[in-house]
Amino acid sequence: HSEESRRRTAENADRMLRSFEDMRAVHDFSFRRAVIFTAHCEGSVQDAYSPLDGDRILCADGGWKFAREAGVKPECVIGDFDSSEEPEGEAIERHPVMKDDTDTMLCVKRALKGGELDFLIVGGFGGRLDHTLANIQTMQYLAERGARAVMDDGITRAETLKEGKTRVSRKKGKLSVFSLTDKCEGVTIRGAKYE
């Protein structure tokens, strides 16, 4: 029952996204990108984040330090501040330590309420395994709602893919493709070592 409900929700989200994409193509308007700085970034913030006009910046807990390193001011710093001090001079949305969502998920939910459909999570890998897995689940949560999600820490980059074509630039490193669901059909890989 739950799996069927989740599938229907994802299908509805896909239809809505296609509708938004059609409207964007016809009316040439763009959606803002929500950029969420997490409290852990294994690599270079500058390699992970290139600013775009109109970026909506949110920070999950200690992610405010990486936002400052990137030279951007967050709309809000969201978290329980169990592992980081609160920043001076920033808008803060404080949550209890004992809660159902991670600080990153709280940022995602705030941005979704604002209508954002394009997400960059800066950091998110490395550090604690439970945080990495929770961030990957957060990307799946976004994909199920029709949003595009990228997580980049300057070393590793993950992106949710949906119907259509995606081109990956040839950079030094490795390419892996995984399904976050039990069924993934119609995927074709061309130009990679293993096709």
Go through each PLM region and give its residues:
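A cross-taxon signal for low-complexity, glycine/charged-rich
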Residues: 2-9
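N-terminal beta-strand-loop-alpha-helix module at the start
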Residues: 17-87
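Short beta-strand segments
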Residues: 36-38, 122-124, 152, 178
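A short secondary-structure junction signal
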Residues: 47-48, 131-135, 161-164, 189-190
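Acidic/Gly/His-enriched mid-domain segments of enzyme catalytic cores or analogous surface patches
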Residues: 51-52, 62-145
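Short, acidic/small-residue loops that bind anionic groups at enzyme active sites
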Residues: 141-158
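Long, charged alpha-helical interface segments
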Residues: 154-156, 161-195
